Protein backbone atom coordinates (compact mmCIF):
# COMPACT_ATOMS: atom_id res chain seq x y z
CA UNK A 1 0.00 0.00 0.00
CA UNK A 2 1.43 3.40 -0.98
CA UNK A 3 -0.75 5.65 1.20
CA UNK A 4 -3.13 6.79 -1.55
CA UNK A 5 -6.84 6.39 -0.91
CA UNK A 6 -8.03 4.91 -4.23
CA UNK A 7 -6.59 1.93 -6.03
CA UNK A 8 -7.69 0.94 -9.54
CA UNK A 9 -6.60 -2.50 -10.72
CA UNK A 10 -7.48 -4.49 -13.82
CA UNK A 11 -6.88 -5.01 -17.52
CA UNK A 12 -7.64 -3.12 -20.72
CA UNK A 13 -8.08 -4.69 -24.14
CA UNK A 14 -7.78 -2.44 -27.18
CA UNK A 15 -9.81 -4.28 -29.77
CA UNK A 16 -10.38 -8.00 -30.02
CA UNK A 17 -6.80 -8.93 -30.89
CA UNK A 18 -3.62 -8.39 -28.92
CA UNK A 19 -3.07 -5.37 -26.72
CA UNK A 20 -3.95 -7.53 -23.70
CA UNK A 21 -1.55 -7.23 -20.81
CA UNK A 22 -1.04 -8.13 -17.18
CA UNK A 23 -2.98 -6.27 -14.54
CA UNK A 24 -2.42 -2.52 -14.33
CA UNK A 25 -2.51 -0.81 -10.95
CA UNK A 26 -2.96 2.89 -10.26
CA UNK A 27 -3.22 4.88 -7.01
CA UNK A 28 -4.43 8.39 -6.21
CA UNK A 29 -6.24 10.33 -3.51
CA UNK A 30 -8.93 11.23 -6.07
CA UNK A 31 -10.91 8.42 -7.68
CA UNK A 32 -11.18 10.23 -11.02
CA UNK A 33 -7.43 10.82 -11.23
CA UNK A 34 -6.77 7.19 -10.32
CA UNK A 35 -8.97 6.10 -13.23
CA UNK A 36 -7.25 8.52 -15.63
CA UNK A 37 -3.81 7.33 -14.54
CA UNK A 38 -4.93 3.72 -14.93
CA UNK A 39 -6.04 4.39 -18.51
CA UNK A 40 -2.83 6.34 -19.32
CA UNK A 41 -0.76 3.38 -18.18
CA UNK A 42 -2.86 1.01 -20.29
CA UNK A 43 -2.51 3.27 -23.35
CA UNK A 44 1.27 3.49 -22.99
CA UNK A 45 1.69 -0.21 -22.25
CA UNK A 46 -0.34 -1.20 -25.31
CA UNK A 47 1.75 0.94 -27.68
CA UNK A 48 -1.55 2.11 -29.17
CA UNK A 49 0.21 5.19 -30.58
CA UNK A 50 1.24 3.08 -33.57
CA UNK A 51 -2.37 3.55 -34.77
CA UNK A 52 -2.37 6.77 -36.78
CA UNK A 53 -6.03 6.96 -37.81
CA UNK A 54 -8.84 7.89 -35.44
CA UNK A 55 -11.25 5.96 -37.69
CA UNK A 56 -9.21 2.79 -37.26
CA UNK A 57 -9.09 3.36 -33.51
CA UNK A 58 -12.87 3.74 -33.30
CA UNK A 59 -13.58 0.82 -35.63
CA UNK A 60 -11.14 -1.76 -34.28
CA UNK A 61 -9.55 -0.67 -31.02
CA UNK A 62 -12.16 0.82 -28.70
CA UNK A 63 -10.92 -0.10 -25.20
CA UNK A 64 -12.62 -2.83 -23.20
CA UNK A 65 -12.05 -2.46 -19.47
CA UNK A 66 -12.19 -5.11 -16.76
CA UNK A 67 -11.22 -3.39 -13.51
CA UNK A 68 -12.21 -2.75 -9.91
CA UNK A 69 -11.79 0.24 -7.60
CA UNK A 70 -10.72 -0.10 -3.98
CA UNK A 71 -11.38 2.65 -1.43
CA UNK A 72 -8.71 1.97 1.18
CA UNK A 73 -10.16 4.51 3.61
CA UNK A 74 -13.66 3.04 3.64
CA UNK A 75 -12.31 -0.47 3.03
CA UNK A 76 -14.73 -1.00 0.16
CA UNK A 77 -14.21 -2.46 -3.31
CA UNK A 78 -16.50 -1.97 -6.29
CA UNK A 79 -16.52 -3.07 -9.91
CA UNK A 80 -15.65 -0.24 -12.30
CA UNK A 81 -16.27 -2.23 -15.47
CA UNK A 82 -16.52 -5.95 -16.06
CA UNK A 83 -16.40 -8.26 -19.05
CA UNK A 84 -19.55 -9.88 -17.63
CA UNK A 85 -21.46 -6.62 -17.97
CA UNK A 86 -20.82 -3.19 -19.44
CA UNK A 87 -17.15 -2.79 -20.35
CA UNK A 88 -17.08 0.83 -21.53
CA UNK A 89 -19.31 3.84 -20.97
CA UNK A 90 -19.81 6.75 -18.62
CA UNK A 91 -16.53 8.05 -17.26
CA UNK A 92 -14.41 5.48 -19.15
CA UNK A 93 -15.83 6.73 -22.44
CA UNK A 94 -15.01 10.29 -21.38
CA UNK A 95 -11.45 9.30 -20.45
CA UNK A 96 -10.99 7.51 -23.79
CA UNK A 97 -12.34 10.42 -25.85
CA UNK A 98 -10.26 12.89 -23.83
CA UNK A 99 -7.23 10.87 -24.85
CA UNK A 100 -8.28 11.14 -28.51
CA UNK A 101 -8.62 14.93 -28.15
CA UNK A 102 -5.26 15.10 -26.37
CA UNK A 103 -3.56 13.19 -29.21
CA UNK A 104 -5.20 15.52 -31.76
CA UNK A 105 -3.55 18.74 -30.57
CA UNK A 106 -0.23 20.27 -29.56
CA UNK A 107 1.00 19.71 -26.03
CA UNK A 108 3.78 22.15 -25.33
CA UNK A 109 5.91 21.94 -28.46
CA UNK A 110 4.95 18.37 -29.29
CA UNK A 111 2.13 17.54 -31.74
CA UNK A 112 -0.10 14.58 -30.91
CA UNK A 113 0.04 11.63 -33.29
CA UNK A 114 -3.49 12.23 -34.59
CA UNK A 115 -2.83 15.96 -35.09
CA UNK A 116 0.19 15.25 -37.28
CA UNK A 117 -1.71 12.79 -39.42
CA UNK A 118 -4.89 14.84 -39.77
CA UNK A 119 -2.89 17.93 -40.77
CA UNK A 120 -0.91 15.83 -43.26
CA UNK A 121 -4.06 14.22 -44.66
CA UNK A 122 -5.80 17.61 -44.95
CA UNK A 123 -3.00 18.71 -47.30
CA UNK A 124 -3.43 15.51 -49.30
CA UNK A 125 -7.17 16.08 -49.62
CA UNK A 126 -6.60 19.68 -50.65
CA UNK A 127 -4.55 18.34 -53.56
CA UNK A 128 -7.04 15.54 -54.30
CA UNK A 129 -10.00 17.93 -54.42
CA UNK A 130 -8.06 20.24 -56.74
CA UNK A 131 -7.29 17.32 -59.06
CA UNK A 132 -10.90 16.16 -58.85
CA UNK A 133 -12.09 19.61 -59.92
CA UNK A 134 -9.64 19.63 -62.83
CA UNK A 135 -10.71 16.15 -63.95
CA UNK A 136 -14.38 17.05 -63.79
CA UNK A 137 -13.71 20.26 -65.69
CA UNK A 138 -12.08 18.18 -68.43
CA UNK A 139 -15.29 16.12 -68.51
CA UNK A 140 -17.35 19.25 -69.30
CA UNK A 141 -18.27 20.28 -65.78
CA UNK A 142 -18.34 24.00 -64.98
CA UNK A 143 -16.94 25.07 -61.60
CA UNK A 144 -19.72 27.06 -59.93
CA UNK A 145 -18.22 27.37 -56.46
CA UNK A 146 -14.42 27.24 -56.48
CA UNK A 147 -12.83 26.26 -53.17
CA UNK A 148 -14.83 28.78 -51.14
CA UNK A 149 -14.04 28.70 -47.44
CA UNK A 150 -16.22 29.06 -44.37
CA UNK A 151 -15.15 28.78 -40.75
CA UNK A 152 -17.17 27.03 -38.06
CA UNK A 153 -18.74 29.55 -35.67
CA UNK A 154 -19.87 26.81 -33.29
CA UNK A 155 -19.15 23.17 -32.67
CA UNK A 156 -19.89 20.86 -35.59
CA UNK A 157 -21.05 17.26 -35.32
CA UNK A 158 -22.07 15.47 -38.52
CA UNK A 159 -23.17 11.84 -38.17
CA UNK A 160 -23.94 11.92 -34.44
CA UNK A 161 -26.62 9.24 -34.76
CA UNK A 162 -24.63 6.80 -36.89
CA UNK A 163 -24.13 3.35 -35.41
CA UNK A 164 -21.15 3.20 -33.07
CA UNK A 165 -20.07 1.16 -30.08
CA UNK A 166 -19.56 4.46 -28.23
CA UNK A 167 -23.28 5.28 -28.63
CA UNK A 168 -22.53 8.50 -30.52
CA UNK A 169 -20.51 9.07 -33.68
CA UNK A 170 -18.80 11.68 -35.85
CA UNK A 171 -18.33 11.49 -39.62
CA UNK A 172 -14.65 10.77 -40.30
CA UNK A 173 -12.96 9.56 -43.46
CA UNK A 174 -13.04 5.77 -43.10
CA UNK A 175 -9.33 5.37 -43.88
CA UNK A 176 -7.59 8.60 -42.94
CA UNK A 177 -9.70 9.63 -39.95
CA UNK A 178 -10.10 13.26 -41.04
CA UNK A 179 -13.47 14.93 -40.29
CA UNK A 180 -15.47 16.06 -43.30
CA UNK A 181 -18.95 17.11 -44.43
CA UNK A 182 -20.44 14.69 -47.00
CA UNK A 183 -21.53 16.11 -50.34
CA UNK A 184 -25.02 14.66 -49.83
CA UNK A 185 -25.44 16.72 -46.65
CA UNK A 186 -24.35 19.91 -48.42
CA UNK A 187 -26.70 19.28 -51.33
CA UNK A 188 -29.51 18.61 -48.87
CA UNK A 189 -29.15 21.88 -46.95
CA UNK A 190 -28.74 23.94 -50.15
CA UNK A 191 -31.85 22.32 -51.60
CA UNK A 192 -33.71 23.04 -48.37
CA UNK A 193 -32.93 26.77 -48.61
CA UNK A 194 -34.00 26.83 -52.27
CA UNK A 195 -37.24 25.06 -51.37
CA UNK A 196 -38.20 27.54 -48.65
CA UNK A 197 -37.36 30.48 -50.91
CA UNK A 198 -39.86 29.12 -53.44
CA UNK A 199 -42.45 28.47 -50.73
CA UNK A 200 -42.08 32.06 -49.50
CA UNK A 201 -42.36 33.54 -53.01
CA UNK A 202 -45.50 31.51 -53.70
CA UNK A 203 -46.92 32.33 -50.27
CA UNK A 204 -47.26 28.67 -49.32
CA UNK A 205 -47.94 28.60 -45.58
CA UNK A 206 -50.28 25.78 -44.60
CA UNK A 207 -49.06 22.22 -44.10
CA UNK A 208 -51.20 21.07 -47.02
CA UNK A 209 -49.73 23.71 -49.35
CA UNK A 210 -46.17 22.84 -48.29
CA UNK A 211 -46.82 19.14 -48.83
CA UNK A 212 -48.19 19.77 -52.34
CA UNK A 213 -45.17 21.93 -53.18
CA UNK A 214 -42.83 19.19 -52.00
CA UNK A 215 -44.60 16.69 -54.23
CA UNK A 216 -44.41 19.05 -57.19
CA UNK A 217 -40.67 19.63 -56.71
CA UNK A 218 -39.57 16.08 -55.91
CA UNK A 219 -42.10 13.70 -57.45
CA UNK A 220 -43.60 15.40 -60.50
CA UNK A 221 -41.96 15.47 -63.93
CA UNK A 222 -40.35 18.62 -65.35
CA UNK A 223 -43.11 20.44 -67.20
CA UNK A 224 -43.76 23.66 -69.12
CA UNK A 225 -46.53 24.36 -66.63
CA UNK A 226 -43.94 24.80 -63.85
CA UNK A 227 -42.91 28.32 -62.89
CA UNK A 228 -39.35 29.53 -63.47
CA UNK A 229 -38.17 29.03 -59.87
CA UNK A 230 -39.63 25.53 -59.75
CA UNK A 231 -37.98 24.61 -63.05
CA UNK A 232 -34.61 25.89 -61.81
CA UNK A 233 -34.96 23.85 -58.62
CA UNK A 234 -35.82 20.67 -60.54
CA UNK A 235 -33.01 21.15 -63.06
CA UNK A 236 -30.37 21.78 -60.40
CA UNK A 237 -31.37 19.41 -57.60
CA UNK A 238 -33.25 16.75 -59.55
CA UNK A 239 -36.51 14.88 -59.12
CA UNK A 240 -37.39 11.21 -58.71
CA UNK A 241 -36.81 10.66 -62.44
CA UNK A 242 -34.25 13.33 -63.28
CA UNK A 243 -30.69 13.62 -62.00
CA UNK A 244 -29.88 17.18 -60.94
CA UNK A 245 -27.23 19.14 -62.83
CA UNK A 246 -25.36 20.33 -59.73
CA UNK A 247 -22.51 18.26 -58.30
CA UNK A 248 -21.42 18.94 -54.72
CA UNK A 249 -18.03 17.71 -53.49
CA UNK A 250 -17.26 16.61 -49.95
CA UNK A 251 -16.00 19.49 -47.79
CA UNK A 252 -12.71 18.88 -45.96
CA UNK A 253 -11.05 21.03 -43.31
CA UNK A 254 -8.00 23.20 -43.78
CA UNK A 255 -5.95 22.65 -40.62
CA UNK A 256 -3.76 25.53 -39.45
CA UNK A 257 -0.50 25.15 -37.52
CA UNK A 258 -0.99 24.37 -33.82
CA UNK A 259 -4.76 24.31 -34.31
CA UNK A 260 -6.87 22.08 -32.07
CA UNK A 261 -9.36 20.13 -34.17
CA UNK A 262 -11.64 18.30 -31.76
CA UNK A 263 -13.23 18.95 -28.41
CA UNK A 264 -15.68 17.08 -26.22
CA UNK A 265 -19.24 18.04 -25.46
CA UNK A 266 -21.92 16.46 -23.29
CA UNK A 267 -25.67 16.04 -23.54
CA UNK A 268 -27.73 14.96 -20.55
CA UNK A 269 -31.02 13.17 -21.28
CA UNK A 270 -33.18 13.31 -18.15
CA UNK A 271 -35.79 10.72 -19.05
CA UNK A 272 -33.89 7.64 -20.12
CA UNK A 273 -36.83 5.30 -19.55
CA UNK A 274 -39.08 7.48 -21.69
CA UNK A 275 -36.64 7.52 -24.61
CA UNK A 276 -35.49 3.89 -24.49
CA UNK A 277 -38.21 1.85 -22.78
CA UNK A 278 -41.44 3.69 -23.67
CA UNK A 279 -42.04 4.58 -20.03
CA UNK A 280 -43.68 7.67 -18.54
CA UNK A 281 -41.13 10.51 -18.03
CA UNK A 282 -40.56 11.25 -14.36
CA UNK A 283 -38.46 13.58 -12.23
CA UNK A 284 -37.30 10.58 -10.19
CA UNK A 285 -35.04 9.38 -13.03
CA UNK A 286 -31.33 10.13 -12.84
CA UNK A 287 -29.78 12.25 -15.63
CA UNK A 288 -27.61 10.27 -18.03
CA UNK A 289 -24.63 12.36 -19.25
CA UNK A 290 -23.45 11.30 -22.72
CA UNK A 291 -20.03 12.56 -23.82
CA UNK A 292 -19.45 12.93 -27.56
CA UNK A 293 -16.75 14.15 -29.93
CA UNK A 294 -17.21 17.35 -31.98
CA UNK A 295 -15.25 19.44 -34.47
CA UNK A 296 -14.11 22.58 -32.68
CA UNK A 297 -15.25 26.12 -33.40
CA UNK A 298 -12.87 28.01 -35.72
CA UNK A 299 -12.08 25.21 -38.21
CA UNK A 300 -12.12 26.24 -41.89
CA UNK A 301 -13.83 23.98 -44.45
CA UNK A 302 -13.52 24.27 -48.24
CA UNK A 303 -16.61 24.00 -50.44
CA UNK A 304 -16.83 23.14 -54.15
CA UNK A 305 -19.84 22.86 -56.46
CA UNK A 306 -19.88 22.07 -60.19
CA UNK A 307 -22.46 22.14 -63.00
CA UNK A 308 -22.87 19.33 -65.56
CA UNK A 309 -22.49 21.17 -68.90
CA UNK A 310 -22.49 17.93 -70.92
CA UNK A 311 -25.96 16.91 -69.76
CA UNK A 312 -27.15 20.50 -70.10
CA UNK A 313 -26.16 20.37 -73.79
CA UNK A 314 -28.03 17.09 -74.18
CA UNK A 315 -31.12 18.74 -72.69
CA UNK A 316 -30.94 21.48 -75.33
CA UNK A 317 -30.68 18.84 -78.07
CA UNK A 318 -33.65 16.85 -76.74
CA UNK A 319 -36.72 17.76 -78.81
CA UNK A 320 -39.08 16.34 -76.19
CA UNK A 321 -37.64 18.25 -73.23
CA UNK A 322 -39.88 21.13 -72.02
CA UNK A 323 -38.96 24.37 -73.82
CA UNK A 324 -39.26 26.55 -70.72
CA UNK A 325 -36.59 24.44 -69.02
CA UNK A 326 -34.37 24.73 -72.10
CA UNK A 327 -34.70 28.52 -71.98
CA UNK A 328 -33.40 28.53 -68.40
CA UNK A 329 -30.38 26.41 -69.37
CA UNK A 330 -29.65 28.73 -72.31
CA UNK A 331 -29.78 31.78 -70.04
CA UNK A 332 -27.27 30.17 -67.67
CA UNK A 333 -24.95 29.56 -70.61
CA UNK A 334 -25.29 33.09 -72.04
CA UNK A 335 -24.14 34.84 -68.85
CA UNK A 336 -21.31 32.39 -68.26
CA UNK A 337 -23.10 30.76 -65.33
CA UNK A 338 -22.50 33.86 -63.18
CA UNK A 339 -26.16 34.08 -62.09
CA UNK A 340 -26.17 30.39 -61.28
CA UNK A 341 -22.96 30.76 -59.28
CA UNK A 342 -24.50 33.61 -57.27
CA UNK A 343 -27.61 31.56 -56.51
CA UNK A 344 -25.66 28.49 -55.38
CA UNK A 345 -23.32 30.57 -53.23
CA UNK A 346 -26.30 32.28 -51.58
CA UNK A 347 -28.12 28.99 -50.91
CA UNK A 348 -25.08 27.35 -49.40
CA UNK A 349 -24.08 30.40 -47.37
CA UNK A 350 -27.61 30.87 -46.02
CA UNK A 351 -27.83 27.18 -45.16
CA UNK A 352 -24.53 27.09 -43.29
CA UNK A 353 -24.63 30.49 -41.58
CA UNK A 354 -28.31 30.64 -40.64
CA UNK A 355 -29.59 27.08 -40.33
CA UNK A 356 -26.47 25.00 -39.73
CA UNK A 357 -25.56 21.50 -40.84
CA UNK A 358 -25.29 18.18 -39.05
CA UNK A 359 -26.82 17.24 -35.70
CA UNK A 360 -28.25 19.51 -32.99
CA UNK A 361 -28.60 22.55 -35.26
CA UNK A 362 -31.58 23.79 -33.23
CA UNK A 363 -29.19 24.16 -30.31
CA UNK A 364 -26.73 26.21 -32.37
CA UNK A 365 -24.40 23.47 -33.59
CA UNK A 366 -23.10 23.36 -37.15
CA UNK A 367 -23.24 27.13 -37.75
CA UNK A 368 -20.55 28.76 -39.89
CA UNK A 369 -19.16 32.28 -39.95
CA UNK A 370 -20.72 34.76 -42.39
CA UNK A 371 -17.49 35.57 -44.23
CA UNK A 372 -16.87 33.66 -47.44
CA UNK A 373 -13.38 33.79 -48.82
CA UNK A 374 -11.65 32.06 -51.71
CA UNK A 375 -8.14 30.68 -51.98
Regions found by a protein language model. Give the residues of each.
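Basic, Gly/Ser/Thr-rich N-terminal segments that form RNA-phosphate-binding interfaces in CRISPR RAMP
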Residues: 1-375
